[in-house]
């Protein structure tokens, strides 16, 4: 039972941290968003890239920036992303976004 509780706390922490950074991407200008999404594309797995391409198509967009903007517009980015991505894929995108964000504080780059 204790393990389940700890697992649940980890999921909540992951969702909170992922959502916070993804919300930052929602406020980026178009050029910055396109640049970061291209960087993310190069860092995520083929499966996650395929899921992103699927989201673009299902959202009737021509590119990932459009799809991301539409997910941001729902006012619940985490929930919108969960329609197209698994929790693991969302974490992968978050990790790549953090690495690609020129404004992020990269604590591991000492």
Curated annotation (Swiss-Prot):
GO terms for cellular component: extracellular region. GO terms for molecular function: copper chaperone activity; iron ion binding; metal chelating activity. Expressed in the hemocytes, fat body and ovaries. Coiled coil: none annotated. The keyword Magnesium does not apply. The keyword Secreted applies. It comes from Rhipicephalus microplus. Has bacteriostatic activity against the Gram-positive bacterium M.luteus, but not against Gram-negative bacterium E.coli SBS363. Has fungistatic activity against C.neoformans, but not C.albicans. Binds and sequesters copper and iron ions. Copper-chelating is crucial for antimicrobial activity against M.luteus. Keywords: Antibiotic, Antimicrobial, Copper, Disulfide bond, Fungicide, Immunity, Innate immunity, Metal-binding, Secreted, Signal. Its main location: secreted. One of its GO terms (biological process) is defense response to Gram-positive bacterium. Disulfide bonds join 26-72, 39-100, 61-66. It comes from the Eukaryota. This is Antimicrobial peptide microplusin. It is found in: Secreted. Residues 1-20 form the signal peptide.
């Amino acid at each position: 039972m204790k393990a389940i509780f700890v697992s649940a706390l980890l999921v909540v922490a992951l969702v909170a941290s992922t959502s916070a950074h993804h919300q930052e991407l929602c406020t980026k200008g178009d050029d910055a968003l396109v640049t970061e999404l291209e960087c993310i594309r190069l860092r995520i797995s083929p499966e996650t890239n395929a899921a992103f391409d699927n989201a673009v198509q299902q959202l009737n967009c021509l590119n990932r920036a459009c799809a991301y903007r539409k997910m941001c517009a729902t006012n619940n980015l985490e929930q919108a992303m969960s329609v197209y991505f698994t929790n693991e894929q969302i974490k992968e995108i978050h990790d790549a976004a953090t690495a690609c964000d020129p404004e992020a504080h990269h604590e591991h780059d000492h």
